[in-house]
């Protein structure tokens, strides 16, 4: 099974793209198509995207999924909501900013999951001389799916916060939910995968989870990567080879890919 995770940074062209003029929509669209074609050549089975922008007349998810021939896909908007009811109302919209998931496998179950993200919007500024400030944190989300491979697999695609201890809480919440999904669907021993921009360095992620790190490679920043904050983790899988990264036409992250069995 080939797994790919990529933070697309809203489809912004980067300096690696010949002739790129940053900020111009037409150029960004061309860069998105080129990046999507590059990933399609890898023939991924599972694709997780972060910082996805879905607007009228423009769909980053569709560009990547259609290029790779992935029929099954899901977008989850990262919108603030004070209640689960309002969150469900917001999720009816297929537009906005969020995360996305696509796969070539049949999907038996799929759901967007809100992760613990609500923080007091009023806080002391980092430079305390300027007192207090108001800022709404991004609502962090995950997409959890059960894939019908030769044996069922539970997959969680996500984009976690940079803040601790919230980051650890979000990862724990996702792992617990995936285990519960497996039990409720009668597949408690099903292998599980978590992939995405986890905003945590490799040495820290190894302390936060019992999942095995399946891909080790520097992913950020895109031009001269010095750290790995994008990860592919698993239970019941092992890496079938070394992880690969690639600088594509969009984003300040590198794409991360690995084969597992």
Where are each of the predicted segments found?
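Short catalytic-loop micro-motif centered on adjacent basic/acidic residues
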Residues: 46-51, 157, 193-195
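N-terminal, active-site-proximal structural segment of metallo-dependent hydrolase catalytic domains
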Residues: 1-70, 74-96, 168-175
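Structured beta-strand-rich core segments of catalytic domains in phosphoester-bond hydrolases
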Residues: 52-150, 246-247
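Short coil/turn segments at beta-strand junctions that form active-site/ligand-binding loops
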Residues: 43, 151-152, 186-191
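Metal-dependent phosphoester-hydrolase catalytic domains
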Residues: 165, 179-193, 198-261
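Catalytic metal-binding/acid-base residues of hydrolase active sites
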Residues: 9, 52-53, 159-161, 198-201, ...
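A short acidic, glycine-rich active-site loop
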Residues: 22-30, 131-136, 217-221
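Active-site beta-loop-alpha substructure in enzyme catalytic cores
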Residues: 141-143, 150-180
């Amino acid at each position: 099974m080939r797994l790919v995770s990529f933070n697309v940074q809203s489809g912004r062209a980067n300096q690696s793209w010949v002739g790129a003029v940053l900020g111009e929509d037409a150029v960004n669209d061309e860069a998105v198509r080129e990046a999507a074609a590059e990933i399609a050549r890898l023939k991924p089975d599972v694709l997780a995207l972060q910082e996805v922008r879905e607007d009228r007349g423009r769909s980053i998810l569709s560009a990547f999924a259609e290029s790779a021939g992935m029929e099954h896909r899901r977008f989850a908007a990262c919108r603030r909501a004070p209640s689960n009811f309002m969150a469900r109302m917001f999720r009816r919209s297929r537009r906005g900013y969020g995360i996305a998931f696509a796969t070539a496998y049949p999907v038996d179950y799929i759901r967007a999951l809100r992760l613990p993200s609500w923080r007091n919007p009023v806080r002391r500024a980092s430079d305390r001389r300027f007192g207090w400030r108001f800022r709404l944190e991004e609502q962090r989300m995950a997409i959890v799916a059960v894939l019908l491979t030769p044996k069922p697999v539970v997959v969680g695609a996500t984009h976690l916060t940079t803040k601790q201890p919230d980051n650890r809480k979000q990862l724990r919440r996702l792992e617990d939910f995936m285990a519960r999904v497996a039990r409720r669907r009668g597949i408690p021993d099903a292998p599980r995968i978590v992939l995405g921009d986890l905003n945590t360095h490799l040495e820290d992620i190894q302390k936060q989870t019992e999942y095995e790190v399946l891909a080790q490679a520097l992913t950020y920043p895109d031009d001269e990567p010095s750290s790995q904050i994008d990860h592919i983790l698993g239970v019941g899988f092992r890496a079938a080879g070394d992880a690969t990264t690639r600088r594509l036409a969009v984003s300040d992250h590198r794409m991360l890919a690995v084969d597992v069995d």
